[in-house]
């Protein structure tokens, strides 16, 4: 995992006003309206997307299906280049918006 991932995630999530963080057992989980949309742990960040988007996202570099279910991906970049940062921001913002659906 890129060592800057936690700081980058924090920078993105701070702009999501209704998100709440809960840390336990080495994992920080963010939710909106009590619905989790992202979880950051030692193996990267897991993000809840629409099922079809998650399936497509899992085919991108450094991304795989999450054990949390078919709507979740695990993103564990070795290097946060511009493309990885773009995907991370887009996925987190989408997950945040979709948490109310």
Give the ranges of each region predicted by the language model.
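Charge-dense, helix-prone N-terminal extensions
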Residues: 1-101
